[in-house]
UniProtKB/Swiss-Prot annotation:
Transmembrane segment boundaries: 17-37, 194-214
Pfam families listed in its UniProt record: HATPase_c, PhoQ_Sensor
Record carries keyword ATP-binding: yes
Reactions accelerated catalytically: ATP + protein L-histidine = ADP + protein N-phospho-L-histidine
Protein name per its UniProtKB record: Virulence sensor histidine kinase PhoQ
EC number: 2.7.13.3, 3.1.3.-
Sorted UniProt keywords: ATP-binding, Cell inner membrane, Cell membrane, Growth regulation, Hydrolase, Kinase, Magnesium, Membrane, Metal-binding, Nucleotide-binding, Phosphoprotein, Protein phosphatase, Transferase, Transmembrane, Transmembrane helix, Two-component regulatory system, Virulence
UniProt topological domain (Periplasmic) ranges: 38-193
Domain Histidine kinase intervals: 274-481
Subunit note: Homodimer.
Localization of this protein: Cell inner membrane
Length: 487
């Protein structure tokens, strides 16, 4: 069973459609055929009885009663509607006249039939029927074919009984008219054969039409399956929303799922990129410290605190970015804590001095101790670390830091004496992967990360010209009131 199911189940939609419609066509064809056969049979019986009764009336008209005997004179030019055998009885059931003397037929007429008008049938065999058809060569040929197929086949003859009351010229008579051609040799017996042929032809014609209908009807599903394969092969990003009404909801939900998955993938990829970038500074400090140890410019006792601090910084950054990845896009600030700005910047300056020790960068800071940052400490460190690292990288020697605070905003200014940022590129440097100077190493990530974080605080970063001759970065943090509720 499992092997069968594996090879044949589940059936495709096209096969299901074809089987279902073919079954419906078959059932309807059988039902219509049976109804037609029943209707034909009833109609055939009524028509046969009417014809036989007409011939009975004809024989009654042609009959003459003389000397207590009955005689029937048939005109030579009389055209009988169908070959029949007529028998005339008196009111006691005595046979008075018959067209031909066929003993088995006379014995087959039941006495009770003669008591009322009615329609009856006589069951006989092929040989007996042959005696009735002795003068009908066409019917004899058909009967011969039946005998060749089945020598024991039963034949059915229709019998009409009509009673005529006594008149002044004629006593009461009962006329029995027997149809000499059996029902099996009439066209009615071919109805079943025709029905089988019509049913077979119907299926042979309908199935190809159903296949075409199924192919046309299921084209949207085939198109959807093809688009899904293209998605798997990375040849498209979304499903085509222009589809049939029945599939619109499915396609819309799938596209929404694809969009959500892509956004989640991009979020984690961006977070991983940001984490990698944020680890550059502590790793550079560790590298510089190890180099100093190797060159014996620093003792182990002095290097150990520096290295432990940077390792702790790396651990904090990893935890920070994992948390940030889960909160990205939620619009919720991680904290409303108050942090003095000067100590945070002192730690960053100390780390950057180690990174750019060979370059001899001179970083100065003029910030009042009262100035504080409201929010997540790691957010502030990440933003200012990227901005200061960018300034140290492009300066010639000097970097200056200043700040001012209003009721709801914190402004921090970072200026350097480097080449500055051209006006045409000042908006581009905050986009991921965009850099004003492509000759120096970098990925164009730091300022983009800084801008994203400041935007979470309803802030911004503004690039302009510095009095030192280089670039001036104004970092603005909003939502700086300690009691302000998060939006």
């Amino acid at each position: 069973m499992n092997k069968f199911a594996r090879h044949f189940l589940p059936l495709s939609l096209r096969v299901r459609f074809l089987l279902a419609t073919a079954g419906v066509v078959l059932v309807l064809s059988l039902a219509y055929g049976i109804v037609a056969l029943v209707g034909y049979s009833v109609s055939f019986d009524k028509t046969t009885f009417r014809l036989l009764r007409g011939e009975s009336n004809l024989f009654y008209t042609l009959a003459k009663w003389e000397n207590n005997k009955i005689s029937v004179e048939l005109p030579e030019n009389l055209d009988m509607q169908s070959p029949t055998m007529t028998l005339i009885y008196d009111e006691t059931g005595k046979l008075l006249w018959t067209q031909r003397n066929i003993p088995w037929l006379i014995k087959s007429i039941q006495p009770e039939w003669l008591k009322t008008n009615g329609f009856h049938e006589i069951e006989t065999n092929v040989d007996a029927t042959s005696t009735l058809l002795s003068e009908d060569h066409s019917a004899q040929e058909k009967l011969k074919e039946v005998r060749e197929d089945d020598d024991d086949a039963e034949m059915t003859h229709s019998v009409a009984v009509n009673i005529y009351p006594a008149t002044t010229r004629m006593p009461q008579l009962t006329i029995v008219v027997v149809d000499t051609i059996p029902i099996e040799l009439k066209r009615s017996y071919m109805v079943w054969s025709w029905f089988v042929y019509v049913l077979a032809a119907n299926l042979l014609l309908v199935i190809p039409l159903l296949w075409i209908a199924a192919w046309w009807s299921l084209r949207p599903i085939e198109a959807l399956a093809r688009e899904v394969r293209e998605l798997e092969d990375h040849h498209r990003e979304m499903l085509n929303p222009e589809t049939t009404r029945e599939l619109t909801s499915l396609v819309r939900n799938l596209n929404q799922l694809l969009k959500s998955e892509r956004e989640r993938y991009n979020k984690y990829r961006t977070t991983l990129t940001d984490l990698t970038h944020s680890l550059k500074t502590p790793l550079a400090v560790l590298q510089s410290t190890l180099r100093s140890l190797r060159n014996e410019k620093m003792s182990v006792s002095k290097a150990e605190p520096v290295m432990l601090e940077q390792i702790s910084r790396i651990s904090q950054q990893i935890g920070y970015y994992l948390h940030r990845a889960s909160m990205r896009g939620s619009g919720v600030l991680l904290s409303r804590e108050l942090h003095p700005v000067a100590p945070l910047l002192d730690n960053l300056i100390s780390a950057l001095n180690k990174v750019y020790q060979r370059k001899g960068v001179n970083i100065s800071m003029d910030i009042s101790p009262e100035i504080s940052f409201v929010g997540e400490q790691n957010d502030f460190v990440e933003v200012m670390g990227n901005v200061l690292d960018n300034a140290c990288k492009y300066c010639l020697e000097f970097v200056e830091i200043s700040a001012r605070q209003t009721d709801d905003h914190l402004h921090i200014f970072v200026e350097d004496d480097g080449p500055g940022i051209p006006h045409s590129k000042r908006s581009l440097v905050f986009d991921r992967g965009q850099r004003a100077d492509t000759l120096r190493p970098g990925q164009g990530v730091g300022l983009a990360v800084a801008r994203e974080i400041t935007e979470q605080y309803a802030g911004q970063i503004i690039a302009s010209d510095s009095l030192l001759g280089g670039a001036r970065m104004e970092v603005v943090f909003g939502r700086q009131h300690p009691t302000q509720k998060e939006e």
